[in-house]
């Protein structure tokens, strides 16, 4: 087992110069008051559109919750006390609302609830949710539209595979589905009578051995892999589940089949069959559970196998950016009782192979005795499929990695070869994104594209040179003509949540502005909004903050932008200490690199460890600062350093030109790849007085098989990896650097050792550096005490080295 806290690791850190345990600190009261404001509820519409559930997320769980036991095995983080995911996200309360009236209906929930879901029955009469407790694990609860709920006694759900996110955060509930009959639930239970968990042997049976006999494929660096036979035993113990059906009225539980490591189980649209994927040995110590060998089978409701769809071997030879051979993306055709659809590679799963078609879609109907029927082929890699409610109509997409071109075809799965190109665009071209087809719940519980005659409806972000203006369009499939039904105005950010009828005559929106908190409204095309909710402003103290979209150019002419935030008491002409906060992205061309993202018309809400807290401390913040890296996808990183320095210089120059920034007092920061960017800028420029690097990876040689969109390995492009490793230039970092890292970082490539080694490199070369390891925190930080402390660290560091630039370097703050 890989524990959450590594004692030898902490002992090593304690030996480092200047390292020691410190108590959690709190930021100033003004920051705390804003940070601890209540969260805004989130609505989930019922299939009938007559009701919505309203959940209030738990924003900051206490660090004690994150400190609960954690098993880090097979790419999953398991809480053995609950048999669910560790560090899961929950709602603290649940309410019903009638739509469109907005009338609230209280929902009976248990005290101190940690709720996940809910999931509506297909007829919208009932909903199911889970409650996670230390005593009972993951409980199953059922509610109705009157707000009455009850717990299904004797049911303990297994949330290891069905918790929403596969071990990386996500919801904490088990895998629960409504059957098409609206009366029955399919659930995954903790294996009955499984006994006590495996005990770590006092004496190992022998060494842990890995061996490759050639033919292996490059593997990305991953966290939380199996490490020994005991880990394997733990994985089997906690991941093994028992499928069962539950009668929603009586609570009767009927076991289905034998227990197994059930990765997924999906009810057929006809409600008579199950598509079950079961993981089995041999496991891998280099891959997560998703790559383990598995069997994909069709079962009847007694658990008897009626058809073997595929036996999938260990996916240890799949090339990076490639796909497995054999059936993948296996699913039910949602408008037939029991027809399977899946995708198979025609190029061996490797983009390096030149073939006329890369993928094909196959279909096989019950009783699954005939030969699969080919229904579509894609020239590029299959990107997704959305089905219509009636007939064989579907939208199928493919994508070409090098050009980033995504194409969408309208095809009839019942008439192979009959396909029309509907859209083709660069996936990074936000300005020409047609939007996403809106779906509708079918009587069997599946969701299909909503079709109104020849029309479908598209919902999109509406990116533009002035920011995002979400829209609702009617799109004619026959003529490919688009009619706009709604677009957010220039003073608000308003997005369509759902249609309230099949013709877009009424729809539900979420509307906000810089001074109006997000609320839900009912609209008609061209009509005025009618309020459904009236949530109050949770943070009135930040309402005077100035927010502005600023556009400018890089020295080579690439269009750039940032969102400028200024304190509410800012006086024009005052030059402020400034924070540049950013995250680099790669682009094929300057046109897409220069596109504006986001909107200044959104409600300003500051939470977590947001960089916007600096505004409350008297800083100007250049948020979402564009840091494009432009070039051929195969070689774009050859000039990463030069481009990111040019991006940063252009941003500072613009802010200084506007009169809001004191050039002598500018700092930089970022999270993950933004942290890597921060290290790079401090190593290769003198633009900044200090930096903040959260959960970064400054040594690219520790990610030797690629990172971000880099396609070459360390051995193919060693000079690029070395140049792009600010760790190698630690002796050049003279500006004070604050390194913050979750002690239990779960992100690929950003191992905590990255920041540990960077600290040693800068310290050993005489630089000013501080390393903060956050107990029990992953790649993103969640604990209440952690969030408070991180805000204190960041503000204190910048107050000392940026706001107070030129002052004494000694301080009692640390």
What does each model-found stretch correspond to?
Residues 12-20:
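Hydrophobic h-region of N-terminal signal peptides that target proteins for export
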Residues 533-574:
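N-terminal cap/lid segment of alpha/beta-hydrolase-fold proteins
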Residues 19-528, 534-545, 559, 594-595, ...:
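Beta-propeller folds
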Residues 1-9:
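Bacterial N-terminal signal peptides that target proteins for export
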């Amino acid at each position: 087992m890989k524990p959450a806290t590594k004692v030898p690791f902490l002992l090593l850190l304690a030996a480092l110069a200047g390292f020691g345990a410190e108590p959690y600190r709190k930021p100033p009261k003004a920051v705390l008051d804003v940070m601890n404001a209540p969260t805004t509820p989130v609505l989930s519409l019922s299939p009938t559109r007559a009701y919505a559930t309203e959940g209030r997320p738990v924003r900051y769980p206490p660090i004690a919750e994150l400190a609960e036991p954690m098993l880090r095995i097979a790419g999953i983080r398991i809480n053995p006390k609950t048999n669910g995911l560790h560090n899961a996200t929950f709602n603290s309360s649940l309410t019903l609302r009638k739509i469109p009236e907005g009338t609230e209906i209280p929902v009976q929930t248990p005290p101190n609830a940690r709720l996940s879901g809910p999931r509506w029955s297909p007829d919208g009469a009932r909903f199911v949710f889970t409650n996670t407790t230390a005593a009972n694990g993951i409980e199953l609860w059922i509610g109705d539209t009157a707000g009455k709920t009850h717990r299904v006694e004797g049911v303990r759900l297994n949330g290891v595979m069905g918790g929403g996110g596969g071990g990386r955060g996500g919801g904490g509930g088990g895998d629960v589905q409504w059957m098409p009959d609206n009366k029955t639930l399919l659930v995954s239970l903790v294996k009955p009578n499984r006994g006590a968990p495996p005990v770590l042997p006092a004496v190992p049976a022998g060494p842990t051995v890995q061996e490759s006999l050639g033919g292996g494929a490059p593997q990305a660096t991953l966290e939380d892999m199996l490490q020994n036979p005991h880990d394997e035993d733990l994985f089997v113990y906690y991941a093994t589940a028992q499928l069962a059906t539950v009668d929603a009225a009586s609570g009767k539980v009927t076991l289905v089949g034998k227990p197994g490591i059930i990765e997924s189980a999906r009810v057929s649209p006809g409600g008579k069959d199950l598509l079950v994927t079961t993981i089995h040995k041999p496991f891998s110590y280099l891959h997560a559970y998703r790559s383990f060998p598995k069997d994909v089978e069709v079962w009847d409701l007694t658990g008897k196998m009626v058809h073997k769809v595929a036996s999938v071997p260990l996916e240890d030879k799949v090339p990076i950016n490639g796909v497995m051979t054999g059936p993948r993306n296996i699913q039910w055709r949602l408008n037939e009782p029991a027809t399977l659809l899946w995708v198979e590679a025609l190029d061996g799963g490797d983009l390096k192979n030149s073939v006329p078609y890369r993928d094909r879609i196959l279909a096989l109907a019950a009783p699954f005795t005939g030969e699969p029927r080919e229904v579509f082929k894609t020239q590029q890699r299959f990107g997704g499929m959305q089905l219509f409610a009636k007939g064989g109509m579907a939208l199928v997409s493919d994508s070409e990695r090098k050009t980033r071109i995504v194409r969408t075809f309208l095809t009839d799965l019942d008439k192979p070869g009959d396909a029309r190109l509907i859209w083709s665009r660069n996936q990074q071209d936000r300005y020409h994104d047609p939007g996403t087809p809106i779906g509708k719940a079918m009587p069997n519980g599946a969701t299909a594209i909503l079709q109104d005659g020849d029309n479908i409806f598209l919902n999109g972000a509406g990116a533009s040179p002035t920011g995002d203006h979400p829209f609702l369009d009617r799109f004619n499939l026959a003529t490919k003509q688009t009619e706009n039904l709604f677009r957010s105005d220039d003073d608000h950010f308003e997005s369509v949540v759902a249609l309230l009828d099949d013709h877009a005559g009424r729809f539900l929106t979420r509307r906000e502005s810089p001074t109006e908190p997000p609320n839900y409204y009912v609209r008609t095309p061209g009509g005025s909004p009618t309020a459904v909710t009236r949530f109050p402003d949770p943070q009135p103290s930040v309402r005077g903050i100035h927010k502005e979209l600023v556009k400018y150019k890089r020295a080579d002419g690439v269009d750039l932008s940032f969102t400028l935030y200024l304190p509410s008491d800012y006086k024009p002409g005052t030059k402020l200490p400034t924070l540049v906060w950013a995250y680099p992205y790669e682009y094929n061309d300057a046109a897409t690199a220069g596109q504006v993202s986001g909107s200044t018309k959104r409600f300003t809400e500051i939470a977590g460890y947001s960089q916007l807290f600096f505004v409350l401390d008297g800083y100007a913040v250049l948020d979402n600062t564009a840091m494009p890296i432009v070039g051929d996808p195969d070689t774009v990183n050859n000039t990463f350093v030069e481009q990111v320095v040019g991006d940063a210089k252009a941003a500072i120059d613009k802010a200084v030109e506007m009169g809001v920034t004191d050039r002598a007092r500018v700092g930089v920061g970022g999270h993950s790849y933004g942290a890597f960017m921060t290290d790079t800028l401090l190593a290769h420029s003198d633009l900044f007085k200090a930096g903040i690097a959260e959960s970064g990876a400054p040594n690219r040689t520790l990610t030797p098989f690629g990172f971000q969109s880099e396609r070459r390995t360390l051995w193919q492009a060693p000079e690029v990896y070395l140049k792009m490793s600010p760790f190698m230039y630690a002796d050049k970092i003279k500006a004070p650097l604050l390194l913050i890292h979750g002690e239990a970082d779960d992100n690929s490539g950003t191992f905590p050792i990255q920041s540990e080694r960077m600290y040693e490199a800068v310290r050993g070369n005489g630089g000013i550096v501080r390393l903060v390891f956050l107990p029990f925190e992953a790649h993103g930080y969640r604990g209440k005490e952690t969030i408070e402390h991180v805000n204190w660290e960041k503000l204190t560091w910048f107050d000392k080295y940026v706001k107070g630039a030129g002052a004494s370097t000694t301080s009692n703050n640390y």
